[in-house]
């Protein structure tokens, strides 16, 4: 756009960018109350980026960060009074990332912002969601324990196999049984985790993992816990085992006074996408993804 000036993001832009982000988050809270509140918006602005100025007024900003594998725009990484300007900012910033994989997190309730990224060839990869806990218990569900580790290995291998199949086509690599055992070995001694299993006829056929996630980003409300994992064996899918795990997790959180449960899932995982939406989880953010070229 000829009347727009694009500049590197600097400290002089912090105040105006934080104001844009605050406006975006206020709109988001109007549609979904279970998000972060009392936010220091300046502190949320992380990474290197660019701004779009019109007549000297900041109208949009974009901040990115890189890992060894990809580049990403986090929950506070973009906001705009004129969303179309984000396309110009991406064109200016993305070459600096020198990464083929790009991901961006945008509010699910902001269609103008989502549309901009769709028109930059990004697609929806993950849904991040939230809901309130409610009283309840799941039939056949109990707390997990260390002697469930053999079944945990079986469930984790089954989950990886499921994600690698169509239509997910995940690049997730199958770990060895020993690697899974090592990953899970300390779970039952770590107070951040709550492991649940569901039994049928005396056999564990599924499990769930609750995780006390640290607050700090716009997605995480106060006093929440994350439902990090729900997996059942293929032969019991559709029999209510997964529903029992979720009901028990919601009830466990309710009994302990949590105000919210967060979750995320891969939308191309058809079982997960339909299952969690049907259980009252409301989308808060979309993780959009693009592979270049």
Listing of model-derived features with the role each one plays in the protein:
Residues 82-96, 229-232, 238-251, 255, ...:
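Conserved acetyl-CoA-binding loop-helix of GNAT-fold acetyltransferases
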């Amino acid at each position: 756009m000829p009347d727009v000036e694009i500049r590197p993001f600097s400290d002089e832009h912090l105040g105006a960018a934080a104001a844009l982000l605050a406006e975006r988050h206020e709109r988001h809270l109007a549609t979904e109350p279970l998000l972060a509140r009392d936010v220091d918006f300046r502190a949320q602005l992380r990474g290197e980026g660019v701004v779009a100025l019109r007549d000297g007024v900041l109208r949009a900003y974009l901040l990115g960060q890189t890992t060894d594998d990809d580049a990403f725009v986090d929950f506070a990484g973009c906001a705009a009074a004129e969303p179309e300007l984000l396309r110009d900012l991406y064109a200016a910033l993305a070459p600096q990332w020198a990464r083929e994989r790009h991901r961006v997190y945008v509010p699910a309730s902001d269609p103008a912002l989502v549309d901009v990224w769709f028109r930059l060839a990004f697609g929806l990869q993950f849904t991040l969601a939230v809901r309130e806990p409610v009283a309840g218990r799941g039939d056949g569900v109990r707390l997990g324990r260390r002697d469930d580790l053999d079944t945990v290995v079986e469930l984790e291998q089954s989950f990886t196999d499921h994600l690698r199949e169509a239509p997910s086509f995940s690049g997730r690599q199958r770990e060895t049984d020993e690697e899974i055992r090592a990953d899970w070995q300390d779970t039952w001694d770590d107070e951040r985790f709550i492991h649940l299993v569901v039994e049928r006829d005396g056999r564990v056929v599924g499990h769930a993992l609750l995780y006390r996630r640290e607050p700090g980003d716009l997605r995480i409300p106060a006093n929440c816990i994350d439902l990090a994992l729900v997996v059942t064996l293929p032969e019991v899918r559709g029999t209510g085992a997964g529903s029992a795990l979720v009901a028990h997790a919601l009830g466990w959180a309710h009994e302990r006074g949590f105000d919210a449960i967060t979750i995320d899932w891969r939308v191309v995982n058809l079982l997960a996408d339909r299952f969690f939406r049907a259980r009252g989880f409301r989308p808060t953010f979309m993780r959009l993804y693009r592979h270049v070229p």
